[in-house]
From Swiss-Prot:
Source species: Homo sapiens
Illness association: Axenfeld-Rieger syndrome 1: An autosomal dominant disorder of morphogenesis that results in abnormal development of the anterior segment of the eye, and results in blindness from glaucoma in approximately 50% of affected individuals. Additional features include aniridia, maxillary hypoplasia, hypodontia, anal stenosis, redundant periumbilical skin. Anterior segment dysgenesis 4: A form of anterior segment dysgenesis, a group of defects affecting anterior structures of the eye including cornea, iris, lens, trabecular meshwork, and Schlemm canal. Anterior segment dysgeneses result from abnormal migration or differentiation of the neural crest derived mesenchymal cells that give rise to components of the anterior chamber during eye development.
Function comment: May play a role in myoblast differentiation. When unphosphorylated, associates with an ELAVL1-containing complex, which stabilizes cyclin mRNA and ensuring cell proliferation. Phosphorylation by AKT2 impairs this association, leading to CCND1 mRNA destabilization and progression towards differentiation.
A single Gene Ontology CC term: chromatin
Subcellular location per the Swiss-Prot or TrEMBL entry: Nucleus; Cytoplasm
PANTHER family assigned to the protein according to its UniProt record, in alphabetical order: PITUITARY HOMEOBOX 2 (PTHR45882:SF4), PITUITARY HOMEOBOX HOMOLOG PTX1 (PTHR45882)
GO molecular function, one term: identical protein binding
Residues where Phosphothreonine is found: T90
Principal subcellular localization: nucleus
Compositionally biased region (Basic residues): 81-90
Span of the signal peptide: none
Lineage of origin: Eukaryota, Metazoa, Chordata, Craniata, Vertebrata
One of the GO biological process terms: somatotropin secreting cell differentiation
Pfam families found in the cross-reference section: Homeodomain, OAR
Protein name: Pituitary homeobox 2
Length: 317
């Protein structure tokens, strides 16, 4: 090899041997080359330099030079890459903004063809229009979130505050703290103020009289209900006077209380089964009942003449 030959020459020079010529044969690319080294100052310098700095292949030097040139180019380009390129801001005119806003109100997500038409109308590029719609949608979503947060913070919002009035304003005379301890007495209720009843000029305590039946009806029903129980111990004259009293009070009751249209049919006499074989026994029993209840049928006649609705009102449940 060439390096081995150079080492031998340098060793001979150091030992003081001065060879006339040294032949070194080495193979490279299937070729045999002959290298001659003569004893000259140039050869000695070259041998000494090759001892401390080994000789490199000429192809390697070219590769190193090309790599160094690339490194220098990269080092020169690094500062430019580190600097961030400044984007150019688009300044929209009032007409362009009006056109874009009108389109945004109609359609917040325009497609490619719509954006191209808007770009033609506004004299802008499609990319500028796309970026504007993207920013406008982000601003719209932010505003919607802020409005929802304000509604949640303020309850139902100012538009519902007028509909919901506090109870203290509606009933100023009613105390909510002591009502359970004092109880709902008639005196406490009479002193409280109720706007609903005051507007109608109605006393809350007198509402019971609006729905309660008249005293005459109740007394009439009581007297009529007590009659059958006391029939047996009362003579006939007293029963006749009581019957006359009922007859006198019934027309006055009908004239005082207006009776609505009765949905029930008038009462019909009950069906009585008559057996021809036992007619004699039935007639005897009927006569016996008539003698025992001497005035009872005349007392029940006024009640039987009433309709179904009047009978339901007169008779207690």
């Amino acid at each position: 090899m060439e390096t081995n030959c150079r080492k031998l020459v340098s060793a001979c020079v150091q030992l003081g041997v001065q060879p006339a010529a040294v032949e070194c044969l080495f193979s490279k690319d299937s070729e045999i080359k002959k290298v001659e080294f003569t004893d000259s100052p140039e050869s000695r310098k070259e041998a000494a330099s090759s001892k401390f700095f080994p000789r490199q292949h000429p192809g390697a030097n070219e590769k190193d030079k090309s790599q160094q040139g690339k490194n220098e180019d990269v080092g020169a380009e690094d500062p430019s890459k580190k600097k961030r390129q400044r984007r150019q801001r688009t300044h929209f005119t009032s007409q362009q903004l009006q056109e874009l806003e009108a389109t945004f109100q109609r359609n917040r997500y325009p497609d490619m063809s719509t954006r191209e038409e808007i770009a033609v109308w506004t004299n802008l590029t499609e990319a500028r229009v796309r970026v504007w719609f993207k920013n406008r949608r982000a601003k719209w979503r932010k505003r919607e979130r802020n409005q929802q947060a304000e509604l949640c913070k303020n309850g139902f919002g100012p538009q519902f505050n007028g509909l919901m009035q506090p109870y203290d304003d509606m009933y100023p005379g009613y105390s909510y703290n002591n009502w359970a301890a004092k109880g709902l007495t008639s005196a406490s209720l009479s002193t409280k103020s109720f706007p609903f009843f005051n507007s109608m000029n109605v006393n809350p305590l007198s509402s019971q009289s609006m729905f309660s039946p008249p005293n005459s009806i109740s007394s009439m029903s009581m007297s009529s209900s007590m009659v059958p129980s006391a029939v047996t111990g009362v003579p006939g004259s007293s029963l006749n006077s009581l019957n006359n009293l009922n007859n006198l009070s019934s027309p006055s009751l009908n004239s005082a209380v207006p009776t609505p249209a009765c949905p029930y049919a008038p009462p019909t006499p009950p069906y009585v089964y008559r057996d021809t074989c036992n007619s004699s026994l039935a007639s005897l029993r009927l006569k016996a009942k008539q003698h025992s209840s001497f005035g009872y049928a005349s007392v029940q006649n006024p009640a039987s003449n009433l309709s179904a609705c009047q009978y339901a009102v007169d008779r207690p449940v």
